[in-house]
Every structure is written in C-alpha cells, then in structure tokens.
C-alpha cells in the first residue's frame, strides 16, 4: 500500500515543519507503507508550475525507489501537452491539477482536455479539495474548496481515473450519487478528512459507496500520518476486512503521449 497524497516543500507564506523527502521516507517506513506519490506543495501557488516540477524531480531523485513524483500540469499554460508527455516518461505516479487556484470553472474546456489526455495515457489525475480547514488558512491562500461540480465534470471526461484528496462526506456523497456506475468506478477518494467515531462517517461510506472506492492518503506534512491509520483501526470489526484500493493499481500507462 502507498500513500497517494504526500508532499515535500513548504507553504510560500508560512513555515511548515518537516518538508524534506528524507523525513518522508522515514515516516513511510514507520507507518509500514511501501511508498508515496509526492507533490511539491508550493506549486499550487505558482503561476508557472515548471520550476516546482523541476525542484520536485531533483529532490526525489535519491529516493525514487520509494517516492514517485506527482507533478503539476496546468492546461491553460503553453506547451502543457509536452509537459504531460515529459513527466509521464519520467515515471510520475499521477498528475496533479489545482483548478480552484487557477480560477477554472467546472466545465472549463482546457481542464477537460487535461483529463481526456490523462485518460488516454493511463495516468491518474489527482484533485485536492483543500489543504487546510477554512478557519486555518492564511490570508494569501484565497482559493476555495474544490466543488462536486468540478469532480463530476471531470469524471465524465473519457477514461480518466480521478483521485480526489481532502474531501469530506458531504462532498463525496454529492459527487458519487450524481455519477453513473461506470463514472463512479473511475473516481477514488482518500479518507484523511473523513470523520471516524463518534460520527462514523467513514464506516457509513464503506457501507454505502464501498471500501474499494478509497485509497490511502496521509497529507504529510500537513497532517499527522497516524490520522489515516486510526481511521481504519477504529472501523467496526465487520468492516476492517473490506480492502481499500492500492493507488498504484490506478496507474496503467497505455501509450506514451505524442
């Protein structure tokens, strides 16, 4: 099992403890995880993601047996198709996109083009609902939470597999029950922001949408890695044997983009 939602790097406007890849490697070993898809946190606020992607690949180079890059591809930026091709050829675990930070509405044609391209290649597209609770956000972090409309629109783009991180129960249900069965199968969620006891939102979702719709994500170093483990450990006994999906199985490269 891998952590699909880890980061290196710090906020561009706030100190963040332990943003280094060597620390992440030790944390994964402690948690018994095989590896991680790793994003470069500052890239969400970069107008041009190329510098952040370069920093990400350089930082992860000594740890590529454990850490796979999750670079950003911005589809309204010149040459994004070439960027997608290059980062896939370099072994990226998934592609990250931040439509809320880029001011893209749910039915943005360029965002859909990125989803279609990821589906054709066979690389998952990762969307982040939030980095922090609204009450904790820095005044310079003005992007709102990802909406269910964004996820539904992208889930209908060809064969793309979506990984949505940071969602709560409300957004997940609003999205899931508005999709066809085939679309539901191509959307996976982490549960780092889904409540366990006493609300038992995760147990409810395991029973209704299915454990196989979930992947493991910690959001390190933004959140403690123990949160996700505790969510699973606190499930009712009859649900603990229901297996979640290993995010690695979602990456099935069909062809190299041209």
Identify the meaning behind each predicted range:
Residues 93-94, 107-215:
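Catalytic pocket-lining loop regions of alpha/beta-barrel enzymes
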Residues 1-4, 37-40, 70-72, 96, ...:
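Active-site neighborhood of phospho(di)ester-bond hydrolases with catalytic His/Asp-centered motifs
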Residues 34, 47-133:
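Active-site gating/metal-coordination segments in enzymes
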Residues 2-8, 17-35, 208-215, 223-258:
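Mid-to-C-terminal alpha-helical segments outside catalytic/metal-binding sites
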Residues 5-11, 128, 166:
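Histidine-centered divalent metal-coordination motifs
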